[in-house]
Curated annotation (Swiss-Prot):
Keyword set includes Cell membrane: yes
Compartment list: Cell inner membrane
GO term, biological process aspect, one: sodium ion transport
Gene for this chain: nqrE
Gene Ontology MF annotations: oxidoreductase activity, acting on NAD(P)H, quinone or similar compound as acceptor
Stretch forming the signal peptide: none
Family assignment from sequence similarity: Belongs to the NqrDE/RnfAE family.
Subunit field text: Composed of six subunits; NqrA, NqrB, NqrC, NqrD, NqrE and NqrF.
Major site of localization recorded for this protein: membrane
Membrane topology label: Multi-pass membrane protein
GO cellular component: Gram-negative-bacterium-type cell wall; plasma membrane
Class of the enzyme per the UniProt entry, highest EC level: translocase
Name of protein: Na(+)-translocating NADH-quinone reductase subunit E
Length: 244
């Protein structure tokens, strides 16, 4: 339930896959509004990316607990066997959004108290983290893949770091583009979308690499196939002896 068939090397694989191979922004284009609006300066993009990674990691963990102990199939069976058939799945989506909004509000208060400059730089886009589809999408992706708890935490962290990496890369390029001679009709959103597409194409080179599968399952499968082959060969030897 907490680690499942995943080993520590599998957790590293999940993190790398969520960050680079299946980058939540560059492969699914979730969270594009904040990505385009807050990437004109590297410092602002870095602060927003760090905030998104923090919110996604913590809310992903909390929402996993809610799914497995409250709203998921047979989730209430830990309270009483009589409650096992109660279905609260209709509350799941709104509950996830409430958790994300509540933690975003807490983060906003902390930034206002301890990092006033970053709070002012992010402006209206800080509370909009609550409705950033990348955060809700990351939570839903992890739950639909039936990750145990620790792999879910690592996947949420990797997805958040992937979003952070994408916006930092884009902000770095945009600062260079500010001094470039760009055709008039491509200035603004035009060159931004072209740049994002080129970054996404670079990450597409990693498509097809899967390093997040649990090794325990593959070991069990290989052991089972070995035992089957041994049984088959033994049966063949027995039948040949009978014929002789």
């Amino acid at each position: 339930m907490w680690l499942g068939d995943y080993s520590l090397i599998n957790l590293l694989g999940i993190f790398l896959q969520a960050t680079f191979i299946q980058n939540i922004l560059l492969s699914t284009f979730l969270g594009m509004c904040s990505y385009l609006a807050c990437s004109s300066r590297l410092s602002t993009a870095n602060g927003l990316g760090m905030s998104v990674a923090l919110v996604l990691t913590i809310t992903g963990s909390i929402n996993w607990l809610i799914h497995h102990f409250v709203t998921g199939p047979h989730a209430l069976s830990w309270l009483s066997p009589a409650l096992a058939n109660i279905d609260l799945s209709f509350l799941e989506l709104i509950t996830f959004i409430v958790v994300i909004a509540a933690f975003t509000q807490i983060l906003e208060l902390l930034l206002e108290r301890f990092s006033r400059n970053l709070y002012l730089a992010l402006g209206i886009f800080l509370p909009l983290i609550a409705v950033n589809c990348a955060i809700l999408g990351g939570v839903l992706f992890g739950i639909t893949r039936n990750y145990p708890f620790l792999p879910m935490v690592v996947f949420s962290l990797g997805s958040g770091c992937g979003w952070w990496l994408a916006i930092v890369l884009f902000a770095t390029i945009r600062e260079k583009l500010a001094y470039s001679d760009i055709p008039q009709h491509l200035q603004g959103m035009g060159i931004s979308f072209i740049t994002t597409g080129l970054i996404a194409m670079a990450f597409m080179g990693l498509t097809g690499i899967d390093i997040s599968k649990p090794t325990a399952k593959s070991v069990v499968i290989s052991d089972t196939s070995t035992n089957k082959s041994k049984t088959t060969s033994a049966q063949e030897r027995l039948s040949s002896n009978h014929k002789a």
